[in-house]
Swiss-Prot record:
UniProt induction comment: Up-regulated in several breast cancer lines, and correlated to cancer progression as a marker of metastatic breast cancer.
Any matching Pfam family: Zip
Keyword terms, alphabetized: Cell membrane, Glycoprotein, Ion transport, Membrane, Phosphoprotein, Signal, Transmembrane, Transmembrane helix, Transport, Zinc, Zinc transport
Assembly description: Interacts with SLC39A6; which triggers cells to undergo EMT and mitosis. Found in a complex with SLC39A6, SLC39A10 and with the 'Ser-727' phosphorylated form of STAT3 throughout mitosis. Found in a complex with SLC39A6, SLC39A10 and with NCAM1; this complex controls NCAM1 phosphorylation and integration into focal adhesion complexes during epithelial-tomesenchymal transition. Found in a complex with SLC39A6, SLC39A10 and with GSK3B that controls NCAM1 phosphorylation.
Modification Phosphothreonine, positions: T536, T553
Protein name (record): Zinc transporter ZIP10
PANTHER family, per the entry: SOLUTE CARRIER FAMILY 39, ZINC TRANSPORTER ZIP10
Location of the region described as Disordered in the Swiss-Prot/TrEMBL record: 126-318, 464-484
Glycosylation sites: N139, N198, N218, N339
Bias kind Basic residues: ranges: 172-188, 229-238
UniProt similarity note: Belongs to the ZIP transporter (TC 2.A.5) family.
Length: 831
């Protein structure tokens, strides 16, 4: 008898050793003091429940102290510390996952890793397997562990038969319970991809004994029941009942169910996981989003799933129904992504007050619920599907409201932009003539820069679909700094090519302007030499005239000359004399080329000629005094006017003045600008109408872009019209008439956008062509050839060149900023 008892005792010891060895084999990836600490906690759980509460308090205190050391100061957690903690947990704000991550999994840690890659916090490498690729490393760990288990635990398989039976309700692996306890405490610290899924509020969590074992199955291990004799099975069943009485750490034995519900707000479904299979989202019983829960639909696991549902007690189902009704009556903030301020507010705590350890223990269930429910993570594909479904599910009344809002917003936008044409009225009375010339030169260049920049940087890329931001990568890893730069080049490829085209236009403008400046200064030096020579000759002629004997002849001698001429008409004699003198002077002054004479030269010639005629004019006055004839003065003035008129039209090239345009009426350039401005406003209306028909956000963004380039464009057009010879009133009237074309374009664009969406891109292309024509054909030649009259107001070519360059570069910069950052302009206006 003694031998038999001894043999039985040895067999029990052997089985205990094998179970312990297999447990160590499965948990082999835990090393260091922390693993020993968890093993010590697991051994503590085997002791009676009176010691479990103390161990749970110690563990809670240990981890809270660690968190407070990392995020707090002096035993208190500040608002910013808690905000940093929530950020590291992926909470506090809703984030959209845009990267395709089917190979990385859909658990919370994988989402955090993808968001970190997406935000540029760290990068994955293609060449080797990164430590953040949690799913692959985890699968390799599971494979290696299972292999070691198969090799080291074969004696157990030889002596003990392993089977899985769905009708066995009381068989529960103690090691699974132990690992369940480890994973509960180390979920936030453990670097894996498995998210801990707690069951619904069970009797064991309330400290009550339960005959129903836990149905949770880990993804990285297999659930197996050991087939033992009936007596051993009963003992093992009793042991399972004792283990079920162990209190889960963090919940005291006398914790009431209602109190737990009040603090935690946690209602989790039954979740069953099978290793090696992907998760399929199924609806939860607590009324949350269907994409929250994970359920495996593997055919081999259907029996286990039916077994789980079969073992559910009636009171558990009733509790689930009650909790569902409570959830429906709860506030919506429990199903939202809460930031720090909202979280503290719902707990009745101010944002400026420090957070104690006791309060933090109350916050932990809410944080775990936010993590488990994935309330702060959204998929980009899901958002697109929701938008499409929302558009499909629109009621006819909603569609009518959206159409009406597009028309109303388009009309308001066009009205505001059209009022920019009245800004010229404010500028004209305030600015004097000199400053206004500077402003006109700058605004003309600014209009050219904004229109050509808008065409090449904004409209053409849009017409080619260059702003499609649905950039999805087939791999959720492998990012580097070089890849980021390549992504930028690919995303803004059309914009950068348009910028290069603008650079070519600007380069040719600089070259042509420099050539014109060189020729101008060369001509100026030649003119100065000729004027110096001419002044010397004129001074000699004036000295000869002053020394002429006629100057010393008395008046009686002048009176005696009339009979010698054969007539008594003094006027005719004087005309002949003047014609002789003027003919000589004209013969001397015909040497310089007529095409290079400007207004300053005419003034100099006029002044020198008046000096030569001064003596003759004095003698005419003396003759008129003696003969009482007043006709001499009139004839002389008429003749001098005819001479000046003959020399005032020597130049019709770059030195023409604005008075020539006024004498001939409104120039062709003015009418072309008016027509171009009207077509421009029509195209603006088309673009704004098409954008508002697609959505309010895009319409407002397009309106801002049009406003930014329309402001300098309208002022530039106003300046060109004034330079062409129009009055201020005429320029305002024509600007308002051209602005009316924008309303017609907006009506057509809105109608086309609502009923023919594919034509919108073609509208952008046509608008770009119109912008380029107006800027490069009408306004750029005005910059190059229309500023010759500025010399009479003290303008120099270098100053004009600087102002024009500033206007062009500033216009290019405005359009480049809009093209690069237009996607950041987001408005959500609802009517």
């Amino acid at each position: 008898m003694k031998v038999h008892m001894h043999t039985k005792f040895c067999l029990i010891c052997l089985l205990t050793f094998i179970f312990h060895h297999c447990n160590h084999c499965h948990e082999e990836h835990d090393h260091g003091p922390e693993a020993l600490h968890r093993q010590h906690r697991g051994m503590t759980e085997l002791e009676p429940s009176k010691f479990s509460k103390q161990a749970a308090e110690n563990e809670k205190k240990y981890y809270i102290e660690k968190l407070f050391e990392r995020y707090g100061e002096n035993g208190r957690l500040s608002f910013f510390g808690l905000e940093k903690l929530l950020t590291n947990l992926g909470l506090g704000e809703r984030k959209v996952v845009e990267i395709n991550h089917e190979d990385l999994g859909h658990d919370h840690v994988s989402h955090l890793d993808i968001l970190a890659v997406q935000e540029g916090k760290h990068f994955h490498s293609h060449n080797h397997q990164h430590s953040h690729n949690h799913l692959n490393s985890e699968n390799q760990t599971v494979t290696s562990v299972s292999t070691k288990r198969n090799h080291k635990c074969d004696p157990e398989k030889e002596t003990v038969e392993v089977s899985v039976k769905s009708d066995d309700k009381h068989m529960h692996d103690h090691n699974h319970r132990l690992r369940h306890h480890h994973r509960l405490h180390h979920h936030l610290d453990h670097n894996n991809t498995h998210h801990f899924h707690n069951d619904s509020i069970t009797p064991s969590e309330r400290g009550e004994p339960s005959n129903e074992p836990s149905t949770e199955t880990n993804k990285t291990q297999e659930q197996s029941d050991v087939k033992l004799p009936k007596g051993k099975r009963k003992k093992k069943g009793r042991k399972s009942n004792e283990n079920s009485e162990v209190i889960t750490p963090g919940f005291p034995p006398n914790h009431d169910q209602g109190e737990q519900y009040e603090h935690n707000r946690v209602h989790k479904p039954d979740r069953v996981h099978n290793p090696g299979h992907s998760h399929v989202h199924l609806p939860e019983r607590n009324g949350h989003d269907p994409g929250r829960g994970h359920q495996d639909l593997d055919p081999d696991n259907e029996g286990e799933l039916r077994h789980t549902r079969k073992r559910e007690a009636p009171h558990v189902k009733n509790n689930a129904i009650i909790s569902l009704r409570k959830d429906l009556n709860e506030d919506d903030h429990h199903h939202e992504c809460l930031n720090v301020t909202q979280l503290l507010k719902y707990y009745g705590h101010g944002a400026n007050s420090p957070i104690s350890t006791d309060l933090f223990t109350y916050l932990c269930p809410a944080l775990l619920y936010q993590i488990d429910s994935r309330l702060c993570i959204e998929h980009f594909d899901k958002l697109l599907v929701e938008d499409i479904n929302k558009d499909k599910n629109l009621v006819p009344e909603d569609e009518a409201n959206i159409g009406a809002s597009a028309w109303i917003c388009g009309i308001i936008s066009i009205t505001v932009i059209s009022l920019l044409s009245l800004l010229g009225v404010i500028l004209v009375p305030i600015i004097n003539q000199g400053c206004f010339k500077f402003l006109l030169t700058f605004l003309v260049a600014l209009a050219v820069g904004t229109m050509s920049g808008d065409a090449l940087l904004h409209l053409l890329p849009h017409s080619q679909g260059g702003h499609d931001h649905s950039h999805q990568h087939a791999h959720g890893h492998g990012h580097s700094h070089g890849h980021e730069s390549n992504k930028f080049l690919e995303e803004y490829d059309a914009v950068l090519k348009g910028l290069v085209a603008l650079g070519g236009i600007y380069l040719l403008f600089i070259i042509e302007h420099c050539i014109r400046m060189f020729k101008h200064y060369k001509q100026q030096r030649g003119k100065q030499k000729w004027f110096m020579k001419q002044n010397t000759e004129e001074s000699t002629i004036g000295r000869k005239l002053s020394d002429h004997k006629l100057n010393n002849t008395p008046d009686s001698d002048w009176l005696q000359l009339k009979p010698l001429a054969g007539t008594d008409d003094s006027v005719v004699s004087e005309d002949r004399l003047n014609e002789t003198e003027l003919t000589d002077l004209e013969g001397q002054q015909e040497s310089p080329p007529k095409n290079y004479l400007c207004i300053e030269e005419e003034k100099i010639i006029d002044h020198s000629h008046s000096d030569g005629l001064h003596t003759i004019h004095e003698h005419d006055l003396h003759a008129a005094a003696h003969n009482h004839h007043g006709e001499n003065k009139t004839v002389l003035r008429k003749h001098n006017h005819q001479w000046h008129h003959k020399h005032s039209h020597h130049s019709h090239g770059p030195c023409h003045s604005g008075s020539d345009l006024k004498e001939t009426g409104i120039a062709n350039i003015a009418w072309m600008v008016i027509m171009g401005d009207g077509i421009h406003n029509f195209s603006d209306g088309l673009a704004i109408g098409a954008a508002f028909s697609a959505g309010l956000t895009g319409g407002i963004s397009t309106s801002i872009a049009v406003f930014c380039h329309e402001l300098p464009h309208e002022l530039g057009d106003f300046a060109v019209l004034l330079k062409a010879g129009m009055t201020v009133k005429q320029a305002i009237v024509y600007n308002l008439l051209s602005a009316m074309m924008a309303y017609i374009g907006m009506l057509i664009g809105t109608a086309v956008g609502q009923y023919a969406n594919n034509i919108t891109l073609w509208i952008f292309a046509v608008t770009a062509g119109m912008f380029l024509y107006v800027a490069l054909v009408d306004m750029l030649p005005e910059m190059l050839h229309g500023d010759g009259d500025n010399e009479e107001h003290g303008f120099c070519p270098v100053g004009q060149f600087i102002l024009q360059n500033l206007g062009l570069l500033f216009g290019f910069a405005i359009m480049l900023v809009i093209a690069l950052y237009e996607d950041k302009i987001v408005f959500d206006i609802q009517f």
